[in-house]
Amino acid sequence: MYLHKNKKGFTLIELMVVVAIIGILALLGLRLYAGQQEKAKNSIVKANAGTIQTLIQAELADKAVEDIDDESEMNSIVTKAGIHNPILGSQQTASHFGNAAPSASTDNAGDVYVWLNLSDSVFHVNGWGADGNDVYADDLTARR
């Protein structure tokens, strides 16, 4: 009696090669996806900075610079904006307001900050990205 071998299916080597290829593709996809997430979060920070700039400009239409040049007034504007920090996952309620540009900060990543140049009464608005650096190379400005 002659035994007929049934050769259906894949060998172990073939299966291991396929699994290795799928693993490599998955790792490449995850690296690209992680980079896209950071870019998206930085885009939200840019949009938040634009919102704050618009609100400051609207306030300056009705008030003098001296009427909104303190931290409590800036915090009120930021709170009124209802902006969401995409990196920390919370609502931003403080403006990090000052009279000079703050240094890079990973503690406040995702927050928008405002500073006032006292010499020319120009408000500068920017935000910290996921890496703690500014999202805009040049600050957005608002003036009367």
Locate each region found by the language model.
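N-terminal leader/signal peptides at the extreme start of proteins
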Residues: 1-10
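Conserved Walker
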Residues: 11, 28, 43
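Conserved hydrophobic/amphipathic alpha-helical signal-anchor segments
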Residues: 35-79
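C-terminal juxtamembrane segment of a hydrophobic transmembrane alpha-helix
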Residues: 22-39
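N-terminal signal-anchor/signal peptide hydrophobic helix marking the start
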Residues: 10-19
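Edge beta-strands of extracellular beta-sandwich domains
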Residues: 137-139
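Extracellular/periplasmic head regions of type IV pilus-like filament subunits
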Residues: 61-131, 143-144
